[in-house]
Swiss-Prot record:
Keywords: Acetylation, Heme, Iron, Metal-binding, Oxygen transport, Phosphoprotein, S-nitrosylation, Transport. The modification S-nitrosocysteine is found at C93. Red blood cells. Gene3D superfamilies: Globins. InterPro entries: Globin, Globin-like_sf, Globin/Proto, Hemoglobin_b, Hemoglobin_oxygen_transport. This is Hemoglobin subunit beta. One of its GO terms (biological process) is hydrogen peroxide catabolic process. GO terms for cellular component: blood microparticle; haptoglobin-hemoglobin complex; hemoglobin complex. The gene is HBB.
Length: 146
């Protein structure tokens, strides 16, 4: 993903304020509620039958944090997202058989959650930079599929 120096500092500055547990749980929860077909990858998570069940589910929160911990690692390696996410791409492709479109959906949901949590601080310029990052991460995660 090509980010200018200014875009890199913009995304890094905001990311430094992100509570990965809180934001991760909300992002994964929203993905599961807004795109319910994604729930099939989380059969072991128990009750995902309603929005309140999803958002109250400890496994959703825990996995959301895990997802954002990986995303945080990617934020440290914006110039090498394919290399950073190579093993996760392989896992999601070969073992979990996740539709790569879901990575794009999760990235867009993450942008919504960041906007919701950071309000006025999440300017159109910040959003534009984050859209590039989540698109780059989605492409890197889908890399093994090609």
């Amino acid at each position: 993903v090509h980010l200018t120096g200014e875009e890199k500092s913009t995304v890094s500055a905001l990311w430094g304020k992100v509570n990965v547990e809180e934001i991760g749980g909300e992002a994964l929860g929203r993905l599961l509620v807004v795109y319910p077909w994604t729930q099939r990858f989380f059969d072991s998570f128990g009750d995902l039958s309603s929005p309140s069940a999803v958002f109250g589910n400890a496994k959703v929160k825990s996995h959301g944090k895990k997802v954002l911990d990986s995303f945080s690692n990617g934020m440290q390696h914006l110039d090498n997202l394919k290399g950073t996410f190579a093993k996760l791409s392989e896992l999601h492709c070969d073992k979990l058989h996740v539709d790569p479109e879901n990575f794009r959906l999760l990235g867009n949901v993450l942008v919504v959650v960041l906007a919701r949590n950071f309000g006025k601080e999440f300017t159109p310029q910040v959003q534009a930079a984050y859209q590039k990052v989540v698109a780059g991460v989605a492409t890197a995660l889908a890399h093994k599929y090609h």
